[in-house]
């Protein structure tokens, strides 16, 4: 404590108030740092989310294009079979 010749009871309130103030300031400083870190982390996540993976996009495009082409082929084949009839043996006499 202080060695100024004052009694403990005279300085105890000031010392306690000073310690409490320092604790409060340290707590507020920690909270501010945590908020800043969270903001930085959120910003990094947003930056990462903005740029999609080009390779995956190209793969997805190719996949959808293949599926579309297959559906078209199946439709054409079904229409052709329908136009020709079932085929089979033909008429029996």
Curated annotation (Swiss-Prot):
Main location class: nucleus
Induction statement: By iron starvation.
Signal peptide: none
UniProt keyword list: Coiled coil, Cytoplasm, Nucleus
Pfam families, per database record: LSO1_2-like (PF22048)
Stretch list, region Disordered: 1-73
Superkingdom, taxonomy of origin: Eukaryota
GO cellular component: cytoplasm; nucleus
InterPro entries hit by this protein: LSO1/2 (IPR054413)
An annotated GO BP: intracellular iron ion homeostasis
Phenotype upon gene inactivation: Mild slow-growth phenotype in response to reduced iron levels.
TM helices/strands, residue ranges: none
Subcellular location: Nucleus; Cytoplasm
Function: Likely to play a role in iron homeostasis.
Full protein name: Protein LSO1
Gene name in the database record: LSO1
């Amino acid at each position: 404590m202080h060695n100024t010749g004052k009694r403990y009871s005279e300085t105890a309130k000031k010392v306690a108030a000073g310690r409490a103030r320092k604790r409060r300031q340290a707590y507020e400083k920690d909270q501010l740092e945590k908020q800043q870190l969270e903001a930085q982390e959120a910003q990094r996540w947003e930056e990462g989310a903005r740029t999609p993976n080009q390779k995956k996009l190209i793969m997805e495009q190719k996949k959808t294009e293949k599926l579309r082409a297959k559906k078209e082929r199946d439709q054409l084949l079904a229409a052709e079979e329908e136009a020709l009839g079932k085929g089979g043996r033909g008429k029996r006499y």
